[in-house]
Amino acid sequence: MSGNNSSLSYKDAGVDIDAGNALVDRIKGVVKRTHRPEVMGGIGGFGALCSLPTKYKEPILVSGTDGVGTKLRLAMDLNKHDTIGIDLVAMCVNDLIVQGGEPLFFLDYYATGKLDVDTAASVVAGIGEGCIQAGCALIGGETAEMPGMYHGEDYDVAGFCVGVVEKADIIDGSKVQAGDALIAVGSSGPHSNGYSLVRKIIEVSNADLNEELEGKSLADHLLTPTKIYVKSTLKMMESCDVHAISHITGGGFWENIPRVLPEGAKAVVDGNSWQWPAIFNWLQTAGNVETYEMYRTFNCGVGLVIALPQAQAEQAIEILKAEGENAWLLGSIANAEVGEEQVEIK
């Protein structure tokens, strides 16, 4: 045995229980603001309870989990933590609505080497704001202080969301057919995808992130939070027969649109129907990125692609615009030959 008779504590090992408790106290108000009537009890229990909304006749649960990728590294480098939580919620809830799901509740996981209560509280405040935008309850979470696993006060976040959809209203792409219209819903920027390439472009171009682009710094463009499409899309679904929705995330157009198309169908996208937001033009120029690679990595200004009957396209666009979205006719669905690519950008 060692001759050192001093008594060791968890804090000596790098885990500050008092800091964790202080964080819980700080975020109670955030959690309360996201409350839904289905939630039973508050935070602090071993598990969180939530009943199903009574309006559903045959409720089907839909779930999703995600992170924010290396956008988090950029946020840490710029010491801006108040919006990354919105990104986290958005990446989860936007995946739920593509199947028609209404988000019910959200849980987060925050892991760090050394807990900075102010930073963590700022992140959770963003998560709360995201939940408010999505209409779901922040029902619980986990804060893990793990010395030796992360460098200093670096941290990572992950989210998990559960929603509900009426069985008869599940959107699975099976109704997609030639002649359907494709509606685009605009993004707020790169959202939370492609940031390893973004950071590489910043490195090789030696970019000054304080440089202004259309009245905003590059840093602000790149850290603009991911749009949350829940309320506007659910509103549109009340009046329109949506056949499919694609959330344009990692893999861009080429990877995400085919995920919701049946065999034998392809999306014909009119590349002249919109102008890329300035940040994407900057990324392409600063990194000398080929157009194909841009569409494979970034959303290029399109956050959602919605397929529905041509006769309902104008109505859908009007509803989305009334809900504050930038929406337009993006293209149409056509028949695809065997072995043909399922996305064509003209």
Curated annotation (Swiss-Prot):
Predominant location: cytoplasm
Pathway(s) it belongs to: Purine metabolism; IMP biosynthesis via de novo pathway; 5-amino-1-(5-phospho-D-ribosyl)imidazole from N(2)-formyl-N(1)-(5-phospho-D-ribosyl)glycinamide: step 2/2
GO biological process: 'de novo' IMP biosynthetic process; adenine biosynthetic process
Region forming the signal peptide: none
Domain of life: Bacteria
Location within or outside the cell: Cytoplasm
GO cellular component: cytosol
Keywords: ATP-binding, Cytoplasm, Ligase, Nucleotide-binding, Purine biosynthesis
Entry GO MF terms: ATP binding; phosphoribosylamine-glycine ligase activity; phosphoribosylformylglycinamidine cyclo-ligase activity
EC number: 6.3.3.1
Cysteine pairings via disulfide bonds: none
Coiled-coil regions listed: none
SUPFAM superfamilies listed in its UniProt record: PurM C-terminal domain-like, PurM N-terminal domain-like
Catalytic reactions of this protein: 2-formamido-N(1)-(5-O-phospho-beta-D-ribosyl)acetamidine + ATP = 5-amino-1-(5-phospho-beta-D-ribosyl)imidazole + ADP + phosphate + H(+)
NCBIfam families assigned: purM
Protein name per the record: Phosphoribosylformylglycinamidine cyclo-ligase
